[in-house]
Amino acid sequence: MVLNSNYDNYKNKITNSMKPLINSVNPAFSNQENPNSVILTTFNDFTNWARLSSLWPLLYGTSCCFIEFASLIGSRFDFDRYGLVPRSSPRQADLIITAGTVTMKMAPSLVRLYEQMPEPKYVIAMGACTITGGMFSTDSYSTVRGVDKLIPVDIYLPGCPPKPEAIIDAIIKLRKKIAQETYKDKSKFQQGNRYLTLNHKFHFVSNINTGQYNKQLDTKISNSQFNSTLDTFIPIKKNENLTFLLKNEDNKENIENKSKD
């Protein structure tokens, strides 16, 4: 067996490359005696790292912007590398991306979905129609001019529609925002008051589903009113019957006269 003279040098290079590299300026460990599996960190940094690495968005698309968001699921952009897992239930999501136009009828459903999400939760307003109402903001009576009138927004993503690269950039900015949060900022997770503009006057009414569906008629209408309506209704029916009978008798007489002739 013949060995090359460079074999020993190659073996030494491999053993040297397998040694852990430690930065002399800002070491990752307290000292070199600690094992490589132990990393010193803080509670805030650990929780922030866990949350920003596992953002689960809620699929909420109402317009053409959702097509651009759906393209992120493919292999070309592959947003799974950021830890994003699409969810269909708001109770399992901590991020909602409002992609598309928000109408007046969709506004209560959107607020309900947001309130069902666990804390902490984040919102990305995607597209011009979501941020300002878009082309429907001038003469439309059924479009909400900005989703921030309903729920608090963390990241605004303009465009009509935004490109998938812009969505990834918005997610990266949101990850940086989460990384800078502290545990003392928990109070900001509380839902604040939503201020509505004069253009959108929402009238909050009580719930109509009272469960009392088998009410008697006399509870709504008094007996006197019910009898008065019957008194006015019965003579009309009698008169109609009399006129119908008279018409039939006249027709019979005409038929008999024609037969005699």
Curated annotation (Swiss-Prot):
Catalytic class of the enzyme: translocase
Catalysed reaction, written as an equation: a plastoquinone + NADH + (n+1) H(+)(in) = a plastoquinol + NAD(+) + n H(+)(out); a plastoquinone + NADPH + (n+1) H(+)(in) = a plastoquinol + NADP(+) + n H(+)(out)
Subcellular location: Plastid, Chloroplast thylakoid membrane
Cofactor: [4Fe-4S] cluster
Keyword entries, A-Z: 4Fe-4S, Chloroplast, Iron, Iron-sulfur, Membrane, Metal-binding, NAD, NADP, Plastid, Plastoquinone, Quinone, Thylakoid, Translocase, Transport
Co-factor remark: Binds 1 [4Fe-4S] cluster.
GO MF entries: 4 iron, 4 sulfur cluster binding; iron ion binding; NADH dehydrogenase (ubiquinone) activity; quinone binding
Membrane topology of the entry: Peripheral membrane protein
GO terms (BP aspect): aerobic respiration; electron transport coupled proton transport; photosynthesis, light reaction
E.C. number: 7.1.1.-
Subunit comment: NDH is composed of at least 16 different subunits, 5 of which are encoded in the nucleus.
Assigned protein family: Belongs to the complex I 20 kDa subunit family.
Protein role: NDH shuttles electrons from NAD(P)H:plastoquinone, via FMN and iron-sulfur (Fe-S) centers, to quinones in the photosynthetic chain and possibly in a chloroplast respiratory chain. The immediate electron acceptor for the enzyme in this species is believed to be plastoquinone. Couples the redox reaction to proton translocation, and thus conserves the redox energy in a proton gradient.
Name of the protein in question: NAD(P)H-quinone oxidoreductase subunit K, chloroplastic
Gene that encodes it: ndhK
